[in-house]
Amino acid sequence: MISKFSLFVEIGRVVVINYGEYINKTAVIIDVLDQNRALVAGPHSGVERHIINFKWINLTPLKVNIQRGARINTLIAAIKAADLETKIAALSAVKKINARATKSNQTDFERFKANLIRRKLNKKVSGEVKKLVNIANRAAHKKAVAQKAAGHVKKTL
């Protein structure tokens, strides 16, 4: 049977912490302690080596090649060898976290300017949609008139 899961909890898996002291930071699983907890460390993001519950982490597709229970210096070397910093920055989860942080740090005037830009864009899009609908309606009307003239009237309810 083929599994529908593609991400597994394993040694070296990069995770994003979603709860607690290190929220929105990335770490690497160093050891799996039991069915609920793992030992993680994130020297690249300031996460100290500690035990964390699986409910507090989100798995990412990235994986570092390390041994079980690796020391911090070994982990740092593996992170540098895998060029993990750039790969982490390209993750969609990290991009969402950064976007949410910048949006929450906006001033009132910046929110106002963004709202104006959004309104202007929506007005352009809705105008183009109206033009396309109008063209489609005209074509349908011409087709109906042509069919009526030919004697093929199709009634719709």
From Swiss-Prot:
GO terms for cellular component: cytosolic large ribosomal subunit; extracellular matrix. Keywords: Ribonucleoprotein, Ribosomal protein. Gene3D superfamilies: 2.30.30.30. GO terms for biological process: ribosomal large subunit biogenesis; translation. Pfam families: Ribosomal_L14e. GO terms for molecular function: RNA binding; structural constituent of ribosome. PANTHER family: 60S RIBOSOMAL PROTEIN L14, LARGE RIBOSOMAL SUBUNIT PROTEIN EL14. Belongs to the eukaryotic ribosomal protein eL14 family. This is Large ribosomal subunit protein eL14.
